[in-house]
Amino acid sequence: MKNYKYDITYVFGSGRNEKLLSKQDHGKEFFYGYPYFSKKDYRLNIIETENQNSSYLTKKILKFMDGFFAKFSKLTFYMNVLISRDTLSQIYNSKNVITSNHGIGMSLFFYISLMKILKKINFIVILSGLFAMRKSNIIVRVLRKIIFTYFLCVVDYLIFTNRSEYDFAVKNYTKFESKFVCLPFCIDTDFWRPKSTPDFEEKKGVLFIGSNGHRDFNLVIEIANKLENIPFTFITNRIKDQDIKSRNVTNILGDWNRGYLSDEEVKSYYEKARLVILPINNTLVSSGQSAGLQAASVGTPLITSSTIGFWDYKTYQNRKNIILLNNNTLDLWAETIQSLYNEKEKLEDLSKESLHLINSNYKLVNFDRELEKYLLI
């Protein structure tokens, strides 16, 4: 049996380690089991996407490779901020490697494939949106298929946090079905819980939050412009003050990775809002999933788009614990928000049912325990 220095190495985007070390209270859902495993005597390690201690020439080559493969496969790579002699050594000495997104997984899989010739490494990639392939020319499709097939051969488990994408992958990539695991994204309900029973006499305004490119930012601006009698709050880095057309909007710079707002501050905005809205473009990416779950967990009703990538049609029921809209037309969104905003009894019912749903199905410990089953022990 080969010796390992680490039981689990997590490979995260930047900022996770700083947040873990912070004394501020925060939600733990984006650490994908790290806090849970740290209490169980696993030997843990973290690598983050940051400037690596590599030579200038190495960085230039890796940056070129990132751009080349991204251009000709339409996949995502971060090799220039991940690959160095030190990080590869840490990965080689790890029994399990867990990446927090598929771009990181794509950046590492070739190196891990070589390491696997010499020793067993359990390679787990957590993903959302990997299978949302963009239409492209034949050269891109051929290269993408080669890279993608190689990646699927190397990875041990793909963890789908979105049931719709999981169903799509199982249907279209049957050869690799044994590697596909559906673990719906869960949240830290110990943190994202209402301080008191939601009071819709006190709650005011509509909240839009998020910077993911699959949100319909133009529609959000138009909705606020049409409903000038309702106050709106935007928390995003994608809408500038000059983009806003009406005076009923408070525009706040927000980005989870950059930490412009603390989780406590974000939670406060969720709790104060009467509604959260998330207009999403029709994509297989589960855009808005974490924000939607966080809103529900504090008892604030959610209106979002019914897309092919909506995270879980099995547990959510339209107009019972969520409002799902079939298209992103301004009139439909404005009319729905206007009618629901002052319908106190319906808001209370949605709040109660969404809280019940989260506490029954989306507690973080459920995700952590299931993920543990796929570790190499």
Model regions and ranges:
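A short, active-site helix/loop in glycosyltransferases that binds the activated sugar's phosphate group
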Residues: 155-178, 189-191
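Conserved acidic donor-binding segment of nucleotide-sugar-dependent glycosyltransferases
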Residues: 211, 316-330, 339-344
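Membrane-proximal helix-turn-helix segments that form the acceptor-binding/catalytic region
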Residues: 85-93, 118, 138-158
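C-terminal alpha-helical cap of glycosyltransferases
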Residues: 339, 343, 360-377
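Acidic anion/phosphate-binding donor-loop and adjacent secondary structure
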Residues: 171, 184-203, 244
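A short, well-ordered alpha-helix in the C-terminal region of glycosyltransferases
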Residues: 332, 339, 346-360
